[in-house]
Amino acid sequence: MSDQEIKSLVYNSEEIISSNVVEYTNRIIEAGITFDQELFTEYVQKALAEFGLLEVYNTIILPTLERIGILWLTNNIMPSQEHFISELVKQTIISNISFDNKIPDSAPSWLVFLPENEHHEIALLLAKYILKENNQKVIYLGQSVPKESLEIVRHHKKIDNILFS
């Protein structure tokens, strides 16, 4: 794919939310297509400073992932490009999850995981972020968790809620 074709695919947006949001989305897609982690980081950090993680997720990340998905389904990008951008999104969410906030002992606990053979954990990571920001205890098991292993967790920890996707 030529540079002009890439730019045409990236900048062809029918959604006009705000010029900044469109710019962030376009640049993040460009970063994914060209494997440019520095460009991704630059624009995501600007967006986070302007909007915060939840707003960035809703107004920039989701439309970006939708457009990346369309590009992938129409064979305009390779799986490696889609995986690259998805991994950077996951890293962004993880880096915003606080690991040092003191959660009260009385706080409800959540067991958070994806069932076996499910690997798309971006939304689950965001759920973890939201729960932690709301002072909830989270036991995050991640992706593709075998059903049998859940009993082990319940044996060792009191679980008030279960969240899976």
Question: Each predicted region: which residue ranges?
Answer:
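Long amphipathic alpha-helical segments
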Residues: 1-101
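C-terminal regulatory/effector modules of DNA-binding transcriptional regulators
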Residues: 72-165
